[in-house]
């Protein structure tokens, strides 16, 4: 866990390259240069969740597009524990409540030492809805009667991903896809 990083995805890549980690979770209280899709900036407001999950993947066995679908559905399922409101997937990688963005997911693949890694950055507006002229955002605390605890949400996400990675290592992809999609 970090107080501040430029981006959790970039920090993950550095951990892979410097320490040769094969998987991990990077959490930061703030990102100074958060990344969105197509080179856009992710607006990172303190109090929200900024994490990246990374792990080694054999892409000869798995289709990268399936991971994006799984990632979005995993996070949607975790967030549904906290709200009765309908959470909609805005393809390819955003989650919306009442047509307002609550979560964005950035998926990248890097190659290092002949291994490929899936880097999945997740930004969730839990307490602060950032202002953006291009889209309207919301935050989870505006759509729930439950107490929001970022560490609990991160732990829930981590647990699901640990199970998924274990399933990937011990089962065929059809099994994993059926379980998580």
Residue ranges and their predicted role:
Residues 1-81, 85, 147:
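N-terminal lobe of the biotin/lipoate ligase/transferase fold
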Residues 3, 89-91, 174:
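Short loop/edge segments at beta-strand edges and connector loops
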Residues 20-22, 89-91, 100:
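Short, basic and Ser/Thr-rich N-terminal targeting/leader segments
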Residues 26, 91, 118-120:
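Residue-level marker for buried hydrophobic side chains located in beta-strands
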Residues 59-87, 97-181:
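Long, positively charged amphipathic alpha-helical accessory segments at protein N-termini or as interdomain linkers
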């Amino acid at each position: 866990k970090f107080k501040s990083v430029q981006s959790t995805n970039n920090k993950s890549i550095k951990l892979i390259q410097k320490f040769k980690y094969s998987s991990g979770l990077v959490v930061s209280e703030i990102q100074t240069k958060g990344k969105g899709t197509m080179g856009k900036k992710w607006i990172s407001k303190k109090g929200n969740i900024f994490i990246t999950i990374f792990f080694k993947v054999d892409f000869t066995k798995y289709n990268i597009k399936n991971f994006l679908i799984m990632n979005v559905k995993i996070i949607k399922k975790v967030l549904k524990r906290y709200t009765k409101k309908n959470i909609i997937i805005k393809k390819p990688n955003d989650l919306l409540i009442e047509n307002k963005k609550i979560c964005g997911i950035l998926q990248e693949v890097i190659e290092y030492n002949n291994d490929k890694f899936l880097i999945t950055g997740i930004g969730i507006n839990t307490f602060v809805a950032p202002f953006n002229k291009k889209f309207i955002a919301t935050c989870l605390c505006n759509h729930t009667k439950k107490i929001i605890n970022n560490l609990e949400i991160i732990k829930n996400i981590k647990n699901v991903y640990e199970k998924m990675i274990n399933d990937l290592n011990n089962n065929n992809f059809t099994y994993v896809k059926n379980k998580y999609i």
